[in-house]
A protein has these predicted regions:
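A conserved active-site cap/scaffold subdomain adjacent to cofactor or substrate pockets
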Residues: 261-293, 303-360
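Long, amphipathic alpha-helical stalk/connector segments used for oligomerization, subunit docking
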Residues: 327-408
């Protein structure tokens, strides 16, 4: 018993030493500890800079500056005081570190910001934050972040759409197997498949244009949205601030802008991420070994597909983007929850929104770029596509032949039954459907052997695939 207790004590002491060592290690590393993969693995600097600590700080400074500018226009603040505030409202003067230092005392981020600004402005600091509430600053700064994010999204989406247009045009007439329910259906072209993506992403750009004015809206009517603290010129003050910042002016708010605006933008990002995953999921499925019709670019000289299976060429960029798309979509639920604020507002939304808005935008930007990378270098094996059609033993042309029989006088139900019976025979025996149909009295009395062979050519049953590609690409190119 004593030995057993001694063993337990030794184990406890060892675990205790490990914990202490880990805590000391973290203390030494300080702010260099990184946990989120956004810090070191995912996302571009262009997107991260908008939602970084510094990006948020810089925009909040600009909102505070715009407030004093508006007061100056209305004669409440002198031009000299405004000039001084504008001079110090820069992140290299009023630093984020100084604001954080003050916040450790005040436990209020915007009050810390105003104190740091007043400290730097000297005698002109009397007017800083005049008539404002914290969320006048916060929500207007977030609107600036959203505006800058949307500008970036417009650019990246247009580039992706252009890449899709190029691919659709290049593969306009590349015949391949259409599949429904995971089964062979009828022939299509790879260009048509991509044209569907083209039209979908063009609609995403249209939606972004439509929602932008609603989501780049700030506010400046104070603690409960009455404008009482702003005085008799409250509306004019708010309008001046929004005009100076390049934001939309709201009609009515509480202490915060309506979170329906954020929901709309996050939902749009989730929608786009779904479209990207759908396109890249198609690439991944068509790259399956048993299909092998397309392939993500693989650097055969250097790239490794597996640490043990040396032959592997995996669609890792597409897989990576598909995984991140799921994170973007997951931000929808907390975005809806953030709209459920008590009365004129509470603070339950604040911490969640530091994740939902930034992570959605940064990850969506990342997967748009990755999708563009995959599609711009996508390998398309047209010979394999024809091979896969031929492997269906003519079954994919059953619809074509059925329609031809109807056009030559056979009732539609009768034609369907003739082809259904012949198709089941082909499936059960492994014989080519064309050969079975050639022996059918119902078919051979209508078509010669050559006419029947012509009906089994995949390129004869593409409908208006090419014209659809042309139209989708034309409309999209006009849009971008």
């Amino acid at each position: 018993m004593v030995l057993e207790e001694f063993g337990i004590l030794q184990k406890f002491n060892y675990q205790h030493r490990v914990i202490i060592k880990h805590v000391k290690h973290l203390a030494i590393m300080g702010n260099n500890v990184t946990v989120s993969p956004l810090d070191y693995r995912y996302g571009r600097d262009e997107a991260k800079s908008i939602w970084s600590r510094e990006g948020r700080h810089e925009r909040q400074l600009d909102v505070e500056r715009a407030l004093i500018w508006a007061h100056c226009q209305l004669g409440r603040v002198s031009p000299e005081d405004y000039d001084k505030v504008a001079e110090i409202a820069k992140p290299e003067i009023v630093t984020a570190d100084r604001v954080d230092e003050i916040e450790r005392e005040t436990r209020h981020d915007i009050m810390a910001l105003t104190k740091a600004m007043a400290e730097a402005a000297g005698d002109s600091g009397w007017c800083i934050h005049l008539g404002a509430t914290s969320n006048d600053i916060v929500d207007s700064a977030v609107a600036l972040q959203i505006r800058d994010s949307i500008n970036l999204q417009q650019d990246t989406l247009k580039k992706l759409l252009s890449t899709m247009c190029d691919l659709a045009e290049r593969e306009r007439d590349t015949v391949m197997l259409g599949r429904t329910h995971g089964q062979a259906a009828v022939p299509i072209t790879f260009g048509l498949k991509v044209a569907v993506w083209v039209d979908e992403f063009r609609r995403h750009l249209d939606r972004l244009d439509e929602l932008t004015p609603r989501v780049i809206t700030g506010k400046f009517l104070g603690a409960v949205g009455t404008g009482a603290a702003q005085g008799e010129n409250a509306f004019e003050l708010q309008n001046l601030i929004m005009q100076n910042l390049g934001l939309e002016t709201p009609i009515a708010t509480t202490q915060v802008v309506g979170r329906d605006r954020y929901i709309e933008w996050v939902s749009w990002m989730a929608n786009v991420s779904t479209s990207i995953e759908k396109a890249l999921q198609e690439v991944r499925n068509l790259q399956r070994s048993e299909i092998a019709e397309v392939g993500e670019y693989f650097d055969a000289e250097k790239q490794v597909g597996s640490s043990t299976m040396a032959h592997k060429k995996n669609p890792i960029t597409a897989e990576n983007a598909c995984g991140l798309a799921r994170i973007v979509r997951s931000m929808i639920i907390p975005s809806y929850e953030n709209a459920l604020l008590w009365h004129e507002r509470d603070l339950a939304n604040s911490s969640a929104e530091r994740f939902t808005l930034s992570h959605s935008m940064i990850l969506l930007d990342d997967i748009i770029i990755k999708c563009d990378k995959v599609l711009s270098k996508l390998g398309v094996d047209s010979e394999r596509m024809l091979y896969n059609i031929k492997a269906q033993n003519g079954l994919v042309m059953a619809e074509k032949l059925m329609i031809a029989l109807v056009d030559n006088g056979m009732p539609r139900d009768d034609a369907h039954e003739v082809l259904r019976s012949a198709s089941m025979n082909a499936i059960n025996t492994g014989e080519d459907l064309e050969d079975i149909c050639a022996r059918s009295d119902a078919i051979s009395k209508i078509f010669t052997r050559q006419e029947l062979s012509d009906l089994f050519k995949p390129e004869s049953h593409l409908g208006f695939s090419g014209e659809i590609v042309d139209q989708a690409v034309k409309i999209a190119r006009e849009r971008i």
